Amino acid sequence: MPHEPLNSYRSGPDERGHFGIFGGRFVAETLMPLILDLEKHYALARVDPAFKAELDGLLTHYVGRPSPLYYAERLTEHVRAIAAHAGGRGGAKVYFKREELNHTGAHKINNVLGQILLARRMGKTRIIAETGAGQHGVATATACARFGLECVIYMGAVDVERQKPNVFRMNLLGAKVVPVQSGARTLKDAMNEALRDWVTNVTDTFYCIGTAAGPHPYPAMVRDFQCVIGEETRTQMLEREGRLPDSLFACIGGGSNAIGLFHPFLDEPNVEIYGVEAAGFGLDKQHAASLAGGRPGVLHGNRTYLLMDADGQIEEGHSISAGLDYPGIGPEHAWLKETGRVTYLSARDDEALDAFQLCAKLEGIIPALEPAHALAKVVEVAPSKPRDHLLVVNISGRGDKDIFTVADYLAPVG
């Protein structure tokens, strides 16, 4: 990575893993040697041309990168019709960054391949991971199958039930899926179990975290592996339009797809950046919008915004999307909110469902429920932008995994 200026938004974290007051590494004493060893190996790998060449080769020939930057013509017509109905003449030109076309159907594989190559360098033979929607679990199981590594996936029992297609895929790929019965039996609880496993099996096990959270160096490492999204978008938009986009949109659970798109543009002051959290039933009801409805605290090894009750106990997040119900957020997003560089919005379940159907009917693309949250805000914001405004939304995953969930929600009651 080129040297960043001191006033850069891209220079974090510091040597202790902090983005301002966020981040860090709050871990058990038994884990600290593993964390420091991981940090050392990652620092060496990221400047090793052989590591980059191997990862780039896999991204090209195994994942199918670069993913297309697609002009969503009919969605653009739709937002311009909304603008015209309101008496305006605007409506942004909407592009999709099509991460759903990657092998395994989401952005998760970008990060997993980087971490698995690192695990092999470290001599680890057993890989563990947590998963919510199942996309990170599938990506991890896929990479482990590719390299002949033992794979154990921790998944909340509720998510096992609502993401059956992905559970079958993981089993088919040779992974052992462990349903987690503690707590709310969702992603937070799966992450707790994975951390317990890691402490118990320190010698042969590598923990492949799926989002830009956790103890340092994970937030920075996951971000770096996902930055291929934003770097490609930058190149592709310059080729298509001769200039950078005017705005970026991405959904946020832990926030890896978003930071991967955003990071290469953070020092471009004319590029507006929007992250979209899950507002669930509404911000005054059950939701998973940590930035909108949470406050700073420590969870899973880092300080960030968390959903907490008055006593500081972690509350359970709710979203129709299994990939967005984490009750925290990556620490770099917490810092970007504090600095004001990124604007964080939220979309309710019903808004995401509407956008899910709209995208399918207008573009012939069935998005995952996660990026449907971002699409909901695109439909809201884009009509107010001028016609020459170039907007990119990250379609971070495909919707195959969600069709049964959506069918249940849309089924007439009684």
Swiss-Prot record:
PANTHER family: TRYPTOPHAN SYNTHASE, TRYPTOPHAN SYNTHASE-RELATED. It catalyses: (1S,2R)-1-C-(indol-3-yl)glycerol 3-phosphate + L-serine = D-glyceraldehyde 3-phosphate + L-tryptophan + H2O. Coiled coil: none annotated. Keywords: Amino-acid biosynthesis, Aromatic amino acid biosynthesis, Lyase, Pyridoxal phosphate, Tryptophan biosynthesis. Belongs to the TrpB family. InterPro entries: Trp_synth_b_CS, Trp_synth_beta, Trp_synth_beta/beta-like, TrpB-like_PALP, TrpB-like_PALP_sf. Pathway: Amino-acid biosynthesis; L-tryptophan biosynthesis; L-tryptophan from chorismate: step 5/5. This is Tryptophan synthase beta chain. Its cofactor is pyridoxal 5'-phosphate. Tetramer of two alpha and two beta chains. PROSITE patterns: TRP_SYNTHASE_BETA. One of its GO terms (cellular component) is cytoplasm. The beta subunit is responsible for the synthesis of L-tryptophan from indole and L-serine. GO terms for molecular function: tryptophan synthase activity. The keyword Lyase applies.
